[in-house]
Amino acid sequence: METLTTFILCGGKSSRMQSEKGLVLFQHKPFIEHIIQAILPITEQIKLITASKEYDYLPYEKIPDLVLDKGPLGGIYTALSHSETEFNLILSCDIPLISTELLQELISKHTEEAGITVFASESKTHPLIGIYSKKILPIIKSAIEADELKMMDLLAKVPHQILNIEESENFHLTNINSADELNDLNINLS
């Protein structure tokens, strides 16, 4: 695959976490630093989709959402609008267990025909760990204009590729949405 840009969707304040989600600490480090650590062996082209000054300590370009209050789809729209590469790795900011190996698998198995490539097990699809092609921007724009913001609805509209994973691999793709989920994660790892 030609050059790739990574965009981390930092979202905003999480009501369930009471703070910026990407800055929640896990093993003494913010979530976002775990994610960046997994990306760096692959590319240094990393940009953050956020308007928050709380991420200013990181040496990466920060891009505020072009459209507000449109959830992850708005973040992906912003990312692809600013991207200079055909292929883009889009990641949410709440996946501290993501590994370089899983990201490399995603990148190596992506085919040019697919507008989106994501992981899925029998029980769960992971749309916010994916390769997104810049060419699907018009489809995302239409979805936002129609207020059709569900990620699974977007997948249904776009030629996409699902990389099947075992149920046990879901663990590394887990997104942490609440303090309870973070506690569960810490217990599972101890």
Curated annotation (Swiss-Prot):
Superkingdom: Bacteria
GO molecular function: GTP binding; metal ion binding; molybdenum cofactor guanylyltransferase activity
Alphabetized UniProt keyword annotations: Cytoplasm, GTP-binding, Magnesium, Metal-binding, Molybdenum cofactor biosynthesis, Nucleotide-binding, Transferase
Gene3D superfamilies from the UniProt entry: Spore Coat Polysaccharide Biosynthesis Protein SpsA, Chain A
InterPro entries in the record: MobA-like_NTP_Trfase, Molybde_CF_guanTrfase, Nucleotide-diphossugar_trans
Enzyme Commission (EC) number: 2.7.7.77
Principal place of residence: cytoplasm
Residue sites binding GTP per the record: L9, C10, G11, K21, D65, D94
Catalytically driven reaction(s): Mo-molybdopterin + GTP + H(+) = Mo-molybdopterin guanine dinucleotide + diphosphate
Disulfide bonds: none
Binding, Mg(2+): D94
Cross-referenced Pfam families: NTP_transf_3
A GO-annotated cellular component: cytoplasm
Record-level GO BP terms: Mo-molybdopterin cofactor biosynthetic process
Cofactor(s) this protein requires: Mg(2+)
Cellular location(s): Cytoplasm
Root EC class: transferase
Matches recorded under CDD domains: MobA (cd02503)
Record note on domains: The N-terminal domain determines nucleotide recognition and specific binding, while the C-terminal domain determines the specific binding to the target protein.
Protein task: Transfers a GMP moiety from GTP to Mo-molybdopterin (Mo-MPT) cofactor (Moco or molybdenum cofactor) to form Mo-molybdopterin guanine dinucleotide (Mo-MGD) cofactor.
Similarity field: Belongs to the MobA family.
UniProt name for this protein: Probable molybdenum cofactor guanylyltransferase
